[in-house]
Amino acid sequence: MAEEESDQEAERLGEELVAIVESPPGPVGLLAAGDGRGGAGGGGCGGGVGISSRDYCRRFCQVVEDYAGRWQVPLPQLQVLQTALCCFTSASASFPDECEHVQYVLSSLAVSFFELLLFFGRDEFYEEPLKDILGSFQECQNHLRRYGNVNLELVTRIIKDGGPWEDPVLQAVLKAQPASQEIVNKYLSSENPLFFELRARYLIACERIPEAMALIKSCINHPEISKDLYFHQALFTCLFMSPVEDQLFREHLLKTDCKSGIDIICNTEKEGKTLLALQLCESFLIPQLQNGDMYYIWELIFLWSKLQLKSNPSKQVFVDQCYQLLRTATNVRVIFPFMKIIKDEVEEEGLQICVEICGCALQLDLHDDPETKCLIYKTIAHFLPNDLEIVRVCALSVFFLERSLDAYHTVEELYRRPDEEYSEGMSTVQNRVRFELLPILKKGLFFDPEFWNFVMIKKNCVALLRDKSAVKLLNENTLENPSSSLKKRVDQQSVEEDQSTGETDPDDASVVQPKGQVNVKRSLSALNTSKVDHSVPRHRCMLCNKEFLGGHIVRHAQAHQKKGSFACVICGRKFRNRGLMQKHLKNHVKKIQRQQIATAQQDDPEVITLEEINGSKSLISFENGNSNTKGLEIETLTASSERNKEVIREHMAEFIKIPIAIPENAIENIIENGKPDASFNNISESLPQCDDDYEEEENEDDYEDDYDLNQETSVLHKINGTVCHPKDVYATDQEGNFKCPALGCVRIFKRIGFLNMHARTVHPTDLNVRQTVMKWSKGKCKFCQRQFEDSQHFIDHLNRHSYPNVYFCLHFNCNESFKLPFQLAQHTKSHRIFQAQCSFPECHELFEDLPLLYEHEAQHYLSKTPESSAQLSEVVPNHQEIDPFSNENQTIHHPVSTSKSRKYSTEPKTYIDTMEKKTDSLVHNGNEHSDDTVSNISLIDQKMPAIEPNPENTHSTTDLVNGHSEIEQTPLVTSDPTLKIDINRNRTENGSILPSVESQEHSALSVSQAPSKPNLTSEQTSYGLIVTKPFVRPLPPSYLDERYLSMPKRRKFLTDIVDACSDQDNMYKKPVKRLRCGKCLTTYCNAEALEAHLAQKKCQTLFGFDSDDESA
């Protein structure tokens, strides 16, 4: 039946092909150039109307493909090709010899014949019906010889040789027999490479992998045939189908170019081998990611995404695979193609994933690649265009990296937009992702723009611009021309009433159009005669955007006060105490005034300040009309003409009646101890100007931070889980103040936080401080719960817990640290063999067990001979070899400055303090001995000697005794064992005396040369009369209590005496008599409380029933 059906199909095919020749000709435009009109057809096509070769070949191919596609076996398809070849031979008699369309049809028929002959062996060639088919093919080839088709001649020769598999060289290659490469290459060059490709496809389809690999390797070794990518694709296919050849797969992968690999992957996917294409894509992609090579990386990632989703449509699996590939990447730029495919394929959730990827990329070390970092910032801004805060931070970060004018314009445009409140519902990412991203973005900023207004941001950004011409252009845009300045001054006179209140509206127009030239002249004359100083600095409130003149911003700050929170209206910093906020705000005003004074002095050398007029003393004006110290400000007037000098004299005449000034140490005493001191009653000196604004600000910040930390601190504290009162650990005086545990330090503090800060900065190596800290924490680290026996070991260990990443890894050569303990635990698991190194210097031993490491480190510190505090307390002060402060001075890396040491000092004002102030005035006035004086004074401040209670050697007291204030007590300067202070009679130009610090070997000589009764000296200088009065030590009863005078004459430190007295007082205290209620048995401390309780008549009997006596 099959043979009959094939015969019928062949007859119908022949009829259709003949009908094509007899069909009417097509349009003239369809005729091919050079095609002739045939006359009577020859052969089976009979005479008829001719048709162009182009139309005939096109319709011929369509009909043959239709009939051949109806069969799935090779023999009927060969019969269809036999009929088609015979009809084409008959119809081609009228076609020209060099027709392109004829050559294409003949080559297609020859290749189709060869592909079908691969299914037959040599023995089948001599059997029917294949013998008749091959005979017809050879006969048609003889008629078509005039066309000279190469493929047709090759197929004819292969048929004569016995078939496509019968060549001896090919047989040797397929059987892996040894053969010369030259012979093989000669055989491969004798045929069309397409024939070898068809043989390889047939062998792979039949799963004859060894023979296919042998043939493919021979073709790859050929210099010309190896250029065909199919043989490389076929080799990958064979290696994929045989898992034993993994090594060959990787080796050939390295030899293949990435661009060729993309073509191979595409061709493999077209053949329907998706898994093979996916593996090939990953094989090419992963090495590129590991090497950081961006060559064709976008194409590979795109192909990988399509193949991955085709093999597994799950979005979650796709995202996980993306993360896995990103972990293997070494070039951060690969995140961009991955974010592109994630955003396109995952849709809504893809945006959040892309933002998280950008955040992770910013945490990498990108200092050497600023361009990539800029691209990441721009990508985040592209993903979150509606989040103004994030877009601003990204634009500012891009400017810091590029420092170009375009980047600055972007920042300026964004910061000029009105602030938008963040809404979680309008955000395209989750709230947690946004708040995790913000700190990461702000790490790259030079400052935090959250607390700065645009004026400060613009000022700092312009300073960072690299292009000088751009900076000049921006400065020219911000400067005003003279006419606009004149108009602004005219407007300032018109709004004089608003200036009197200290407030101006920034929204009002600052330019008023003058009515003619005469009005302008009148305005100028009025301005020249006016005594209003328009150079007063203005301050803009960042909370309400209002502008204020001079110090009115301090009074305005009260309008923004909230319960428990006080914010600075200039920088936005928050405080818990109003006094600290106002002091911080006044520092802003002072700094701006100093900057303007310095600028004016540089611009105009004739500027006159009050320092030149009144001996560098600042006058205090009452801003609010009262004498409250919170409203006091320094008013410094400047002038550049004789008219301004008169204004200054008038101001001096107005304010000379109020010569009130506050010494700096009194204000600092209030800040430190929480209440004003008695020294406020004897204020006699003006506010000194701080030489270093930054140092003052740092000290102020320290106090404010400690205040915030201790504001809510409870009276009872927990020490490693045990409730303990601070007074049980720290020494206290009779008023409950905390004493510094350092040796020789008599500082007293109201709060523990101030004491801890003082001990950290001033006595970091003191033995008593270490022991107190050890006692306070009971020798246990609060971070790692490790127990310590030696105080020095404990302090060294605490220094390793550096904020903010306090949990550090103990592994050898691992410097990782983390914020949370579980992060450290996860990191520790990454070390396959955990080896911890001893932290002691010059010790390199490694341990696998932490208990062994702890025991080993403890041996280092136990082997050292510890100094006991008892030995140090019994040291004789006159011993010349022991200096309790020498070790401290050697180990302090950041010495305390003079101004900072005065803040820490709470001793009464001594002769040294007086000399310090005089020396400061000499330094400011340009004395030639200023350098030596400053160094001596700083040394005196840092090395204060121990104080003894003996009346003969008493130098200062720490408490107020018999109601005397600290200023009234004027003790002598002590003599330190290693430091002798002698007051030489080295007089300066103005008659003041300079103290000098001399060594011990010259101290005796200095004392002998000093006069016994110095006379009173005075000298008239340009800024006042200076009287130098010698210091006379008062008698001990004038400043000591009777109980101190009647004490035994024993040499002890004052701190020990005070402790002994407090302990003795506690021993002799009479026991408190307690009273008890007869009904409820409640105990009371005094009779008044008991009477008040009984008067209420609310207590009941303890057992709830009457006694027998009452019932009777």
From Swiss-Prot:
Principal location listed in the UniProt entry: nucleus
Disulfide bonds, paired cysteine numbers: none
Keyword line: DNA-binding, Metal-binding, Nucleus, Phosphoprotein, Repeat, Transcription, Transcription regulation, Zinc, Zinc-finger
Pfam families: zf-C2H2, zf-C2H2_ZN292
Biased composition, class Polar residues, residue ranges: 886-899, 1002-1018
Gene Ontology CC entries for this record: nucleus
Gene3D superfamilies: Classic Zinc Finger
An annotated Gene Ontology molecular function: zinc ion binding
Modified residue annotations for Phosphoserine: 1107, 1111
Protein location: Nucleus
Zinc finger intervals, C2H2-type: 566-588, 738-763, 779-801, 807-831, 836-860
Spans annotated as Disordered: 482-514, 885-906, 997-1018
Family to which this protein belongs: Belongs to the krueppel C2H2-type zinc-finger protein family.
Task of the protein: May be involved in transcriptional regulation.
Protein name: Zinc finger protein 654
Species, as recorded: Mus musculus
